[in-house]
């Protein structure tokens, strides 16, 4: 691995816990720079303005790439006037990562409702917007544990849609694309020469030979067999309810799940505080803490930094492999 360039930590929604997490993230030991408005940081934060990632600052001082916002941060009360600046920060971070000035980005949480209300934000979330900024590349979301062994890494093949729509949205093309993106990312970003991927069935007991649904037998198993012949190390379709105990996780490196809760319930149960959100398929590294803006505790100084610290460390490790 090579020495990675600094990570950009975007400010996220300034009315959330992002501003108080930034100085706490110095405990990660990872070189990073905060991109946002320093006026939103907690009172007493030691910070120094830099003009480019990597400019030296004193130990224990937060390096800040300044991006001024039009309104102050009121904890728990997002201001629509700040929405355009939140979006600009994300785009600026992507420019820095794609130009090579930064090793990657770690994004603090945004509030989609506030962005839509204040700036007409037309994307479901960070992931889709980042894919758009990168040239509308196909991406998948991975959630990865950092404190449990064997690791739990999950990829929901369908994400933010009603459960009733999953059977139609889970297509052979979508699953194949997710397998290919995940396999490539596990090789490049996790250093695995032959990633082992487990594929969860859609139905209870993976359909139980068609008794509880036929998607597994009708098209999932044939797709998996075809990709095996190409050289992919795949197992499945597997019953999802027995995929996540320690002995099962030891048999694969990442699990592809049919829908949101099938993937996120196990990761959040096993490693709620230490989970990291990773976008696979981008031309740059992107991670984020696995939590939201937490308006209910914003500004109180009690937000747990474990997930953002884990996300920064993972971004740093991934960037060092690129």
UniProtKB/Swiss-Prot annotation:
Q: Mostly located where?
A: cytoplasm
Q: Which reaction does it catalyse?
A: 4-(phosphooxy)-L-threonine + NAD(+) = 3-amino-2-oxopropyl phosphate + CO2 + NADH
Q: Which UniProt keywords apply?
A: Cobalt, Cytoplasm, Magnesium, Metal-binding, NAD, NADP, Oxidoreductase, Pyridoxine biosynthesis, Zinc
Q: Does the keyword Oxidoreductase apply?
A: yes
Gene behind this chain?
pdxA
Q: Where does substrate bind?
A: 126-127, 268, 277, 286
Origin organism is: Paracoccus denitrificans (strain Pd 1222)
Full protein name: 4-hydroxythreonine-4-phosphate dehydrogenase
The biological process GO terms on file are:
pyridoxal phosphate biosynthetic process; pyridoxine biosynthetic process
